[in-house]
UniProtKB/Swiss-Prot annotation:
Coiled-coil ranges from the UniProt annotation: none
Protein name listed in UniProt: Thymidine kinase
EC numbers for this chain: 2.7.1.21
Gene Ontology MF terms: ATP binding; thymidine kinase activity; zinc ion binding
Keyword annotations: ATP-binding, Cytoplasm, DNA synthesis, Kinase, Metal-binding, Nucleotide-binding, Transferase, Zinc
Catalytic residues in the record: 88 (proton acceptor)
UniProt keyword Oxidoreductase present: no
Binding annotation for ATP: 9-16, 87-90
Lineage of the species this protein comes from: Bacteria, Pseudomonadati, Pseudomonadota, Gammaproteobacteria, Enterobacterales
């Protein structure tokens, strides 16, 4: 039975690695996968899902105007697909998450979504909000803070390495701009940034 999965975490927990491994597992069995990634995130190249450990795969791009249902249905009609995998799902719109539900319910295809739960202010991203609400299965991928506790928050850093406590929700960056931390160290960093 097909289901909608949401694998979520803070940054650097291995979401892209897990996506690539899942896709490989299907392909190894002779099954076709369709991989998507957000057009806005081109840190590792356009149309590429890349992991920090060196794995990568080509992917179709999506943006806020992309009809995922139309693309998936057309691809599936042309050559059967066995699994849909999407990276950077925090950037999905409400409508796109609804379309992914349709892919599961009407096309009977499993959909595996990978993304951040919250932004640098601790607020849900739109895509994450609706995936948390509508996914059949929620799976937290864990990473650790520098203190050894589970990291469930993301700090955005300025050029001097200080926490940023306001600004646009989406600013694309990697390890130089963001760090995953536990809630305690998140609060300490934000407090220090607000008081300086």
């Amino acid at each position: 039975m097909a289901q909608l999965y949401f694998y979520y975490s803070a940054m650097n927990a291995g979401k892209s690695t897990a996506l690539l491994q899942s896709s490989y597992n299907y392909q190894e069995r002779g099954m076709r996968t369709l991989v998507f990634t957000a057009e806005i995130d081109n840190r590792f190249g356009v149309g590429t899902v890349s992991s920090r450990i060196g794995l990568s795969s080509q992917a179709q791009l999506y943006n806020s105007g992309t009809s995922l249902l139309s693309i998936i249905a057309a691809e599936h009609q042309d050559t059967p697909i066995h699994c849909i995998l999407l990276d950077e799902c925090q950037f999905l719109t409400k409508e796109q998450v609804q379309e992914l539900c349709q892919v599961v319910d009407e096309l009977h295809l499993p959909v595996l979504c990978y993304g951040l739960r919250t932004d640098f202010l601790g607020e849900l991203f739109p895509g994450s909000k609706y995936l948390l609400a509508w996914a059949d299965k929620l799976v937290e991928l864990k990473t650790i803070c520098h203190c050894g506790r589970k990291a469930n928050m993301v700090l955005r850093l300025d050029e001097q390495g200080r926490a940023v406590h306001n600004g646009e929700q989406v600013v694309i960056g990697g390890n130089e701009s963001y760090v995953s931390v536990c809630r305690r160290h998140y609060k300490e960093a934000i407090k220090a940034a607000c008081c300086s």
